[in-house]
Amino acid sequence: MFEVHSRSQAEVLEAGRIVLDRLELRQQERIKPALASVQVITNVDPYQAQLINRFRRGSMLVPGRTMLVLEVAPAAYINFAANEAEKGASIEIVHISGLGRFGRMWLSGTESEIMQARDAAVNALEALDGVTGR
């Protein structure tokens, strides 16, 4: 995974263009993301929250909240999905992992916030073009 950060989106886009040029790749050659799983769990039980929070050190899942579990391949696209979900709704990122074949994220919030975040993430992933994954 390679990330570029700047206050200027134009600088980030230019950096991406330069990296692709140096690697002799084109954006159109990227693998199109494929959703593997999208699940919404409402009214999380306190015991479920305790199990999920066992190894958390940051945001934690609060009992009674709604949780979104989203998985996508290739794994790196999960970061894009999380960013779009955060822009789409006021949610908490409980867990995100972009390693392996599938990227996974767990988000929490109110039911309406999670539905907005889900829609934002799924729509953004489905809007990306690319070649069919291998």
Residue ranges and their predicted role:
Residues 2-4, 87-128, 132:
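C-terminal binding/interaction regions
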